[in-house]
């Protein structure tokens, strides 16, 4: 059986989901996997030794502080004209690859063009998506253009996702749904998207105890451990690293915290970047789930996958969404609303504010209760298994 997996290449969350799904599909029958993606996603797949097919990049312009540059992004896309050309080129590549490979199933993770290509070739298709409604940041100079672009994306993308034979949203059921705002759509879409829960490669019960994992990392069981994997697009990472690492280094010394930072650089392996006092910075953490279970608090940028993984492992979070990144901002505010996280805006970052937030997350029982409940719910769900079974079923006709 051949599977054509088409994840969005911005960041690593989408490709990791597809990698998990391929492993679960192989529990049912032998599967050859072909990953058609771009950007960081393509680099990750190549590094992992999987079959990687490059498609045309889609880039988002960023400011030096990690903020999404809405005006420049729209301008570089020719206010839609260049974007149409990019879509056409990507569609041609997908059609060419699919025609050559002859896949039994196409799996798109937030890549609408692959769904279109699959339907043009009459191939069965599964779609994974958690952001169905796109909110574009509203800047005064670009207000009209932003509104038009937002309306156009909702009107275009929604029907494309529905072209797939099955559409899955990898998120918690209510009241713990993190992508709730991004799923608010006209009634036409009601019942067309299936909430299946978080997609995990490893479940908490498959790993050793938190105490044992801490000891393996050189941390005493009673010492508070903070884990900060630097996630998101490569253009937004440098500013956040320069801002947060000195703050955490001072807090490690002042508060007696242990901190592990991963720079999100799989190309460098698990090489130690530097170590100072209670803070250890690595280029990449191979066993993300071991560090997640070992930690007491996760610091992340509001990415959907990272939030769901932390909730599944019972870990409260400090979320720092990038400026003007509406999806991560909405994810973060929703996580705060359900009681599993505190949120700091990027301009609020300082030793005092971060220290206060971490103390609350470590000490206040309300956070432990909320993540305990989300962990219980996650233990009853198997999103990867549900999607894998449906993909194999569709591939088998």
Q: Which stretches of residues belong to each language-model region?
A:
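A donor-sugar binding/catalytic signature common to diverse glycosyltransferases
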Residues: 105-109, 135, 287-330
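A nucleotide-sugar donor-handling region in carbohydrate enzymes
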Residues: 145-235, 264-267
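Conserved donor-nucleotide binding/catalytic region of nucleotide-linked donor-dependent transferases
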Residues: 342, 347, 352-374, 397
